[in-house]
């Protein structure tokens, strides 16, 4: 398995990761996504308290190369956003699985996480694309 794909996270086909943290799920973009985007210059975040829907856009990430939509891996309520990205959006590039997280969602059904890909499935997706 690739070193840059943490085994303790879940993944989406849109190259986002999800980490269960208590009753909520922290979401960010993968190493692959940030490398494809290039230097991130802006991240549009949803409002805390807003509802996000699985597979639907919840934000935008802009880089020197492209503007890409961010899609929610789960349906639920946004309980926290990474306000630090307003001043330092490049944190998505330098620490995508840590300080570069994007939102924290309280899922309406915690079992939704089980439907996401594990690291092995995500690695296979990357190898086949």
Curated annotation (Swiss-Prot):
Which InterPro entries would you find in this protein's record?
A: 2-oxoA_DH_lipoyl-BS, Biotin_lipoyl, GCV_H, GCV_H/Fam206, GCV_H_sub, Single_hybrid_motif
Annotated membrane-spanning segments are: none
Q: Name one GO cellular component term.
A: cytosol
Q: Does the keyword Metal-binding apply?
A: no
Cofactor stoichiometry and binding remark: Binds 1 lipoyl cofactor covalently.
Q: Which residues form the Lipoyl-binding domain?
A: 24-106
Keywords carried by this UniProt record: Lipoyl
Give the cofactors, semicolon-separated: (R)-lipoate
Name a single GO biological process: glycine decarboxylation via glycine cleavage system
Q: Which residues are in coiled coils?
A: none
Highest taxon in the source lineage: Bacteria
Q: Which PANTHER family match?
A: GLYCINE CLEAVAGE SYSTEM H PROTEIN (PTHR11715), GLYCINE CLEAVAGE SYSTEM H PROTEIN-RELATED (PTHR11715:SF3)
**Its biological function?**
The glycine cleavage system catalyzes the degradation of glycine. The H protein shuttles the methylamine group of glycine from the P protein to the T protein.
Indicate the quaternary assembly: The glycine cleavage system is composed of four proteins: P, T, L and H.
Q: Which family does it belong to?
A: Belongs to the GcvH family.
Q: What is this protein called?
A: Glycine cleavage system H protein
């Amino acid at each position: 398995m690739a070193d840059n794909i943490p085994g303790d996270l879940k993944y989406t086909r849109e190259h986002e990761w999800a980490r269960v943290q208590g009753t909520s799920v922290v979401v960010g973009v993968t190493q692959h996504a940030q490398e494809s985007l290039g230097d991130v210059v802006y991240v549009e975040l949803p409002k805390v308290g807003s509802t996000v829907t699985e597979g639907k856009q919840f934000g935008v990430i802009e880089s020197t190369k492209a503007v890409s939509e961010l899609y929610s891996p789960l349906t639920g309520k946004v309980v926290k956003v990474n306000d630090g990205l307003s001043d330092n959006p490049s944190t998505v590039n330098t620490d995508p699985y840590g300080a570069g997280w994007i939102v924290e969602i309280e899922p309406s059904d915690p079992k939704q996480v089980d439907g996401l890909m594990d690291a092995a499935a995500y690695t296979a997706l990357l190898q086949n694309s």
